[in-house]
Amino acid sequence: MKGLFFSLFTIRDLRGKFLFTLFILFIFRVGSYLPIPGIDPVALRSYFKSQSDFSITNYFDFFSGGAFSNFSIFMLSIGPYISASIIIQLLVYSFPSLKKMQEGEHGKKKIKKYTKYLTIVAAVAQGYATSLYAKSIPGALNIPFYRYIFIAILTVTTGTFILLWFGEQINQKGIGNGVSLIIFSGIVVRLQAALFNLFQSMRDPSQNINPVFVILVLSVFILVVMLIIYEYKAQRRIAIHYARANTKNTVSSYLPIKLNPSGVLPVIFASVLITLPLQILSGFAGVSVLSRQILSYLRPNGFYYTLLNVVLIIGFTYFYSKIQLSPKDISNNIRKNGGTIPGIKADEMEGYLDSIMNRTLFSGSIFLSIIAIIPFLVQNIFRFPYDVSRIMGSSSLLIMVGVALDTLIQIDAYLKTQGLSRRTSKQYAFLQKI
């Protein structure tokens, strides 16, 4: 890994991309501490200190990197955009006319435009809900509520689009996937606080945390990270033979089907899809008994929350993977290029690929589900602090590891395009061996 960091600072273009990415993420972190106009930060700090670790606000705060508890301009993060993307993709998958539209370049631009329109709707809805939540906090507002609600909705909606613009700038001028890195940075900043809370709890006799359990759980943490890396790279290879033109010889190739083709997207989608209704319900918790009951049932790291998270992760794993890898499209492309799968008839190819993908995705989704229940087990069996259990959970671990690997692979690809792959191949050999 020394060679990797050496390349980041010795290759001029790569150094520029790396520093630009850090600069954008730094601005995001600074913005996470800028409160919405009309909010009293002192009243907020006093209120959130009195909240339980299991409160819904701590859950929101975890994925926003502390922006939610500060009621900052970035308190919604990019959640509204991801929610809108999920809805649009479900519609595209359900309606053939939209699917056909997406195939053309003009149609893709229309779909992106619809996604941004829906992002505005989602941001306004979440902004309104968080405004109601702010009203329920004693002394939080230092301006009239009717003025605050307008300012808050406008501010957080603008903040979401600023973050989307940041993500696009990272995609164009930086390193890695911009949106994923923004989520990644929000989780990573909580890592230091989580470790500090763990050591503080170990020193507190009332917490009754056994140091042996700490070593055991941290060992499991390292093991899970290694398994996630393995799962990220694991793939099923299907042999394909292509006939050469004007000859009887064939060329052998293979079709790689990853254990989890959609990467961290199912985890991000599941987290956001849970967060959106909870955020809206939290705004009405002060006036609605039903909202309070639903929020108590879906308490973070509770049984029903964990169960819903597992179901959503499995569902999105299948849904998004089938969008990325359509057995029908793949089989048609193989036939058009004169390819065959040994032992499989041409008209049976689609069914064969579909069955292989279903079995592969089943294994991948079960793996993700097992990791999804880790926070529940760590919190309820070992009684670890909430932040620590969240860091060890599916959402945080998979996002951190997945985004880090994606960024490394993008750096490797960039170096290869610049003719520097021989100098740096040893740095990335570990990725190829996994």
Segments from the language model and where they lie:
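N-terminal cationic and glycine-rich segments that engage phosphates or anionic surfaces
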Residues: M1-I434
